[in-house]
Amino acid sequence: MKYIGAHVSAAGGVENTIARAQAIGANAFALFTKNQRQWQAAPLSEASIRAFKLACEKAGFRPEQILPHDSYLINLGHPDPDGLAKSRDAFLDEIKRCEQLGLCYLNFHPGSHLKQIPEAASLTLVSESINWALERSQGVTAVIENTAGQGTNLGWSFEHLATLIDGVEDKSRVGICFDTCHAFAAGYDLRTPESCAQVFADFDRIVGFQYLKGMHINGAKCTFGSRVDRHHSLREGNLGEAVFHHIMNDDRFDGIPLVLETIDETIWGDEISWLRSLAKA
């Protein structure tokens, strides 16, 4: 089964995300468990945790249908020891929040070398940061997102992702979230059925489909290979529709959250319905 949804607002409490997902016809969703643009946040209240779990149970959302995202401030490959320590502490806090909510994934951008250390050294720091956090937690899988490669961001190439996974000691608790817009911006051509098949064959060969835990389903305002991160609605922009047809008709994308981060939330319900319509009977 395809689990399709969007990154919904947690305004007013994480327990409110479930109703927002249901309102757009979703059977998957993403959320922030805290303000994504602040380092510190109040702990989740027991009341919020109970309400979230109860709402998920009533609506039929299991942990594998939900893809929490961490703060944009965190940089697990930070070249400065103080910045790295701050990022690691914040990342562990995010994992602990997922633990409290009974969730099994935490999606995150790997980090950036900031032009201060070699790329390879920063990739090693990211893997070491993941190991550090996993040793201090349980039950939550660290889900690395491929990036557009904007600036000095790591994780834009399949080789980067494979290197990061290779450095993680507990392979059962690491995975990948594949973002269609980011891949396109990074130079992976998803515009035709043939090129889609090739990209996903390369992904399987270099990274491995066994590590795919979720996807971000996005159109692209950016141009191909531009290394610029600019999302668009699914049927607008430069990416085209071939990749969405491919995803909806390939059972390797079953059973994982397929999450919209498209730019017009007023049409998320329509986009979800359209994606479902692409599946061949």
Swiss-Prot record:
Gene3D superfamilies: Divalent-metal-dependent TIM barrel enzymes (3.20.20.150). Endonuclease IV plays a role in DNA repair. It cleaves phosphodiester bonds at apurinic or apyrimidinic (AP) sites, generating a 3'-hydroxyl group and a 5'-terminal sugar phosphate. Zn(2+) 2 binds at residues 145, 179, 216, 261. The gene is nfo. PROSITE patterns: AP_NUCLEASE_F2_1, AP_NUCLEASE_F2_2, AP_NUCLEASE_F2_3, AP_NUCLEASE_F2_4. Its cofactor is Zn(2+). Zn(2+) 1 binds at residues 69, 109, 145. This is Probable endonuclease 4. Belongs to the AP endonuclease 2 family. Keywords: DNA damage, DNA repair, Endonuclease, Hydrolase, Metal-binding, Nuclease, Zinc. It is an enzyme of class 3 (hydrolase). The keyword Transmembrane helix does not apply. Binds 3 Zn(2+) ions. Zn(2+) 3 binds at residues 182, 229, 231. It catalyses: Endonucleolytic cleavage to 5'-phosphooligonucleotide end-products. One of its GO terms (biological process) is base-excision repair. GO terms for molecular function: deoxyribonuclease IV (phage-T4-induced) activity; DNA binding; DNA-(apurinic or apyrimidinic site) endonuclease activity; phosphoric diester hydrolase activity; zinc ion binding. SMART domains: AP2Ec. InterPro entries: AP_endonuc_2, AP_endonuc_F2_Zn_BS, Xyl_isomerase-like_sf, Xyl_isomerase-like_TIM-brl. PANTHER family: APURINIC-APYRIMIDINIC ENDONUCLEASE, ENDONUCLEASE IV ENDODEOXYRIBONUCLEASE IV.
